[in-house]
């Protein structure tokens, strides 16, 4: 521990002069969405706030770069990563401010779900496992999403530092790739769409096009399950704080958590991988159980994560700290 603390604040002999690779990813996404904002300026509800929000992120990124340049050490490197991971909570609802003005596609995904499986798994899963134990387990898995990401980043920082920048590049890149899809493929997920069309239509297999309904309505169904559970309330509180009718396809919960598991597999830390595996499986199941995603979303989230991981791992093969 003593050596770890010493290494934490030991000045680097050859500090990085410019932005880190993951910060360039953030700036690329910021520029892309800024162009979209200007193109849709007269349509968006509050484009000025979106522009100023991006300027603040640029300023914060520059400030963290300056802190690192003044004190170039592992601690300030970690702080730079922590800031960008923390800002994901701002970027997520921002996707809704753009895609709320695009035609909603839930009616297509719900119909594909019906055609593929002959039912709506998001409607039936919780009914098949209604008990408090199952409810709390799935809600616990869903609530473990961000802690799982943080645990992966902290593990690489503390135990596999030479690939810390590489791992954070892969995690943040995958997030922003999913966010681009969320913007241009406006799917809200069952909890919002079922609420909009009524459960009677869902059970009858009728999935009408709601057009721009979610531009004016953000109501969703309460999560199914044991309503007095601790983890149930954690999930509901998170939904109340920042959930928007956006980001259903593909499931980034499944996608990014899969990438975290693959990162642990890449380092061959099978003990940590085995420890997180139950939470990972519960999380993947929970996306459908709590009606946040269609089953299609979860499947594509898993497949896309494997593809993204392979591509990003290859791209980042030179991002290893000597």
Task: Tell me the role of every PLM-derived stretch.
Residues 78-83, 150-185, 192-205:
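Interfacial segments of alpha-helical transmembrane regions
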Residues 2-57, 75-149:
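N-terminal transmembrane-helix/juxtamembrane module of multi-pass inner/ER membrane proteins
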Residues 184-266:
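Membrane-interfacial catalytic/cofactor-binding modules of polytopic membrane enzymes
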Residues 65-74, 154-162, 264-268, 310-316:
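Structural signal for the C-terminal ends of transmembrane alpha-helices
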Residues 57-69, 147-152, 302-306, 312:
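Hydrophobic cores of alpha-helical transmembrane segments in multi-pass inner/ER membrane proteins
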Residues 20, 228-322:
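Membrane-embedded catalytic cores of phosphoryl/pyrophosphoryl-handling enzymes
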Residues 56-60, 141-153, 176, 249-261:
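Hydrophobic alpha-helical transmembrane segments
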Residues 31-39, 87-93, 175-183, 280-289:
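Aromatic-anchored segments of alpha-helical transmembrane domains
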């Amino acid at each position: 521990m003593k050596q770890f603390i010493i290494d934490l604040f030991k000045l680097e002999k050859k500090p990085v002069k410019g932005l880190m690779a993951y910060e360039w990813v953030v700036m690329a996404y910021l520029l892309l969405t800024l162009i979209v904002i200007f193109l849709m300026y007269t349509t968006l509800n509050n484009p000025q706030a979106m522009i100023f929000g991006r300027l603040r992120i640029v300023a914060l990124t520059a400030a963290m770069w300056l802190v690192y340049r003044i004190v170039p050490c592992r601690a300030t490197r970690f702080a730079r990563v922590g800031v960008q991971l923390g800002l994901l909570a701002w970027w997520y609802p921002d996707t809704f401010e753009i895609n709320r003005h695009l035609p909603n596609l839930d009616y297509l995904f719900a119909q594909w779900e019906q055609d593929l499986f002959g039912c709506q798994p998001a409607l039936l899963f919780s009914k098949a496992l209604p008990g408090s134990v199952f409810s709390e387990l799935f809600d616990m898995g869903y609530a473990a999403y961000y802690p799982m990401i943080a645990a992966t980043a902290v593990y690489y920082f503390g135990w596999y530092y030479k690939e810390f920048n590489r791992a954070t590049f892969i995690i943040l890149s995958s997030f922003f790739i999913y966010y681009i899809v969320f913007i241009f493929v406006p799917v809200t997920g069952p909890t919002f769409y079922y609420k909009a069309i009524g459960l009677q239509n869902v059970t009858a297999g009728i999935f009408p096009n709601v057009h721009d309904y979610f531009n004016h309505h953000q109501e969703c169904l309460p999560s199914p399950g044991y309503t007095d559970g601790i983890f149930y309330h954690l999930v509901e509180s998170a939904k109340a704080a920042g959930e928007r009718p956006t980001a259903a396809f593909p499931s980034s919960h499944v996608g990014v958590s899969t990438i975290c598991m693959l990162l642990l597999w890449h380092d061959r830390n099978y003990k940590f991988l085995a420890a997180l595996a139950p939470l990972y499986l519960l999380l993947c199941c929970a996306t459908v159980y709590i009606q946040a995603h269609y089953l299609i979303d979860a499947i594509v989230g898993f497949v896309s994560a494997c593809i993204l991981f392979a591509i990003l791992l290859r791209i980042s093969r030179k991002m290893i700290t000597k």
